[in-house]
Amino acid sequence: VLVDARNKDSIASAARDVFLLVNALPLSFTPNVMDAALEVGAHYQDYAASTAFAKEWVDSIHYQFDVYGPKFEKAGLLALIGTGSAPGLICAATRDAMRYLDTCESIRNLVWEGIEAKRFQPFWWSPEVALEDMSELSYAYIDGKLIRREPYTHEIKRHYDSMSREITFAEHSHDEPVYYSLHPEEYFKGVKNVVFKYAGAGMDFAKPLY
């Protein structure tokens, strides 16, 4: 089946009678997929919050929750936003850890992609989205406020048992600090500081370009 993701009707036509519509497209197509899911009465899932609903990405995240959330609820449908590995699995693991804590002051999400391809393949996902992510200011939740930082800064070094060498993690624009800042008291034991730091082949490739 050939589907034109630029056309909501094309998506809806292909999605008739499906239970769950999974959106793995570049972020700009998210409005079409969400609207198609509502039209055909399908549950919805994506891997990262879209940038397409507002000029500022944080506003776009809020739009998905605040505007589309009630639409799916009214239709008796579930919409899951940001359910990849990061964001997604890493968020679930962080939330699960809260049951072992009385309070939480700081969260550091550290992601290292230690796999390197034998051929030139700088990113495992959309190059367009990746290069945009790699070049924009990062998000950090510091002292209870969401702020922006220069990418590739505020480095920290780690050498865990599973690593063959010491790895340098640095600032990278990602969803997690934004997500955790939405309901810090309710879901993250009152956390005041959240950072996301990234390392691996993608960062090594993109840093000189920045």
Stretches with model-predicted labels:
Residues 2-20, 29:
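Conserved Rossmann-fold cofactor-binding substructure of NAD(P)-dependent oxidoreductases
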Residues 50-58, 86-88, 112-118:
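Short gly/pro/ser/thr-enriched loop/turn and capping motifs at secondary-structure boundaries
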Residues 39-40, 75:
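Helix C-cap/helix->beta junction micro-motif
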Residues 3, 47-49, 83:
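Short beta->alpha connector loops at strand-helix junctions that form conserved
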Residues 99-210:
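C-terminal catalytic/substrate-binding lobe primarily of soluble NAD(P)-dependent oxidoreductases
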Residues 47-77:
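Rossmann-fold NAD(P)-binding glycine/threonine-rich loop
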Residues 68-114:
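Adenosine-phosphate binding glycine-rich loop
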Residues 15-24, 44-46:
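N-terminal Rossmann-like NAD(P) cofactor-binding module of classical short-chain dehydrogenase/reductase
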